Every structure is written in structure tokens, then in C-alpha cells.
Curated annotation (Swiss-Prot):
Residues 1-24 are annotated as: Disordered. Residues 1-13 have a biased composition (Low complexity). It is found in: Secreted. GO terms for molecular function: hormone activity. This is Meteorin-like protein. It comes from Homo sapiens. The gene is METRNL.
Length: 311
């Protein structure tokens, strides 16, 4: 139930005119802004910091200046809210405890009514478009490794002064294996045997169960999968609750992207996944008989990463 979800790539536009110059063409504007922010320091950019969240307004800038503002957030989760966006923001995210960047995943979810700016992943001047202006699809989550870069938020040209707010929530999640990032970035791609075995040991939830119903929500570009669980291996949050009948089963709901095309099916599956922004997101989900085969093969070779019951 996991498939490659292609990320949109692109460069920011050039909303602010610059005088022509002879010789080689100047660098792209977003890269130029980043360089200026580093060179000018306090002279050409503002610096803001807060433990978890930041809220600011472009109205504090002089009308003729398109500033790049540095925002430093040192927390596991929070939000950024930028009213009347002008210029650009460089959002620096770090955990509030020591942890190597290569072990951290950043996930962002834009506000439903977010507009006025594009959100990019930036590293050494290269930009990858994460959330285009106005794409505030509810529930849409974008994730990347912290070592892949930082967030560059660039205001888009506007013809009026109507109120616009660019905003998003963020989470910093410690990942135990590289496969955890695949789960976030490619939730529809089928898992390999190794990924399944790691998922059952390291996911926020792992259960054996069947699909009772699937509710597609086009407005969220999401599908809600309603599960009946016969065996609960692990869960960090109360995703699954005992059924009212008290027959030893549990029930709960997990989510995945609409594009994965999940449908109700017969038989038991192993469902694994992680919590993001308070919701259970589906990761690896092989048929249970296939998981039994994977686990048995790994056990015979002494390669199973943890002990679980497969009866």
C-alpha cells in the first residue's frame, strides 16, 4: 500500500525587479537572497527566535524593502504563521535536545487557508518546491530529512493588499532507520521484506487486522481506513480501542493518501505506521501470510530485528 509519490520540484519566481548587468547573468533571485542574508547580517535581514512557534507580519517591513528574515525554532513541534508575506523567511529548525541531523525527519503540514508564499526545501542554493502558494489541502503532510536542507518561504507577487497568511505546523521526528523516511515520502510504494521487518519493530503502531471500510476524502486528498484488529503488537497512542462487544478485538482508523487507491479487501494484513500531527498514518501493510513468510525466512538466517508472535 505504498507507492512513489512524486515531489514537485521547482525554483522560486523572481517577483522583484533587478537592474540589468553586463557579463554573466546573475544568480537566481532566491539564491541571491540567501547569500545576502548571510553576508549582510543585521544590516539586511531581521532575526527572530522563539522556543517552538513564530508569528510575524510583513507589514513591519518598509514598503520598498524586500527583506529576508531569519527564524530560529528549537523545539520538537510548533508552527509558523506569517501574515501579509513580503520578502522571504529562512526557517531554521533544530531539536531541543542533542540529536544528529541525519537521524531526524522534518514534517510540515500547511494551514488549510495558507496563501501568499511558496514553501521550499533549500540546500546550498538549490530549491525544491514543497508547498506552492495556495495549496493548503487539509491534512497534506510533506516530510524530508533534516540533513537535506532547511525551509525557505518566499512571498509571491500580489496585486492587492488583501490579508493573506502563510502558515504551517512542523514536527521533528527521530527516525531509527532510513526506511522510516521512505514511509513518509512514498506511502504507496510496496515495502521490501527488510522494510516490513523493521517497521513491525520500530513503528508507532503495529497490528494484525482486516479492513472493514474505506472512506475516501477528495477534499483532503486522503483515505481513512477503518480496521478491525485481532492482535495488537504495539501502539504509542490510543489509535485502537477495544470494540464495544468485548470479544477481544480492537477497532481504529488510520490514514493514507487518496492516490494510493486503498479498497476494502478480504483476509488479514499487518498494518504498521507512525503518528503525525495527531493522526495515524499508514506505513507498511503486507498481507499477514506474506509477513509470516518474511519473518520465518529472517528468523532462520538470524536476521530478524526483533521477536514478535506470528501465530
Amino acid at each position: 500500500m505504498r507507492g512513489a509519490a512524486r515531489a514537485a520540484w521547482g525554483r522560486a519566481g523572481q517577483p522583484w525587479p533587478r537592474p540589468p548587468a553586463p557579463g554573466p547573468p546573475p544568480p537566481p533571485l532566491p539564491l541571491l537572497l540567501l547569500l545576502l542574508a548571510g553576508l549582510l547580517g543585521g544590516a539586511g535581514a531581521q532575526y527572530s527566535s522563539d522556543r517552538c512557534s513564530w508569528k510575524g507580519s510583513g507589514l513591519t517591513h518598509e514598503a520598498h524593502r524586500k527583506e529576508v528574515e531569519q527564524v530560529y525554532l528549537r523545539c520538537a513541534a510548533g508552527a509558523v504563521e506569517w501574515m501579509y508575506p513580503t520578502g522571504a523567511l529562512i526557517v531554521n529548525l533544530r531539536p531541543n535536545t542533542f540529536s544528529p541531523a541525519r537521524h531526524l525527519t522534518v514534517c510540515i503540514r500547511s494551514f488549510t487557508d495558507s496563501s501568499g508564499a511558496n514553501i521550499y526545501l533549500e540546500k546550498t542554493g538549490e530549491l525544491r518546491l514543497l508547498v506552492p502558494d495556495g495549496d493548503g489541502r487539509p491534512g497534506r503532510v510533506q516530510c524530508f530529512g533534516l540533513e537535506q536542507g532547511g525551509l525557505f518561504v518566499e512571498a509571491t507577487p500580489q496585486q492587492d493588499i488583501g490579508r493573506r497568511t502563510t502558515g504551517f505546523q512542523y514536527e521533528l521526528v527521530r527516525r531509527h532507520r532510513a526506511s522510516d523516511l521512505h514511509e513518509l515520502s512514498a506511502p504507496c510504494r510496496p515495502c521490501s521484506d527488510t522494510e516490513v521487518l523493521l517497521a513491525v519493530c520500530t513503528s508507532d503502531f503495529a497490528v494484525r487486522g482486516s479492513i472493514q471500510q474505506v472512506t475516501h476524502e477528495p477534499e483532503r486528498q486522503d483515505s481513512a481506513i477503518h480496521l478491525r484488529v485481532s492482535r495488537l503488537y504495539r501502539q504509542k497512542s490510543r489509535v485502537f480501542e477495544p470494540v464495544p462487544e468485548g470479544d477481544g478485538h480492537w477497532q481504529g482508523r488510520v490514514r493514507t493518501l487518496l492516490e494510493c487507491g486503498v479498497r476494502p479487501g478480504h483476509g488479514d494484513f499487518l498494518f504498521t505506521g507512525h503518528m503525525h500531527f495527531g493522526e495515524a498514518r499508514l506505513g507498511c501493510a503486507p498481507r499477514f501470510k506474506d509477513f509470516q513468510r518474511m519473518y520465518r525466512d529472517a528468523q532462520e538466517r538470524g536476521l530478524n530485528p526483533c521477536e514478535v508472535g506470528t501465530d
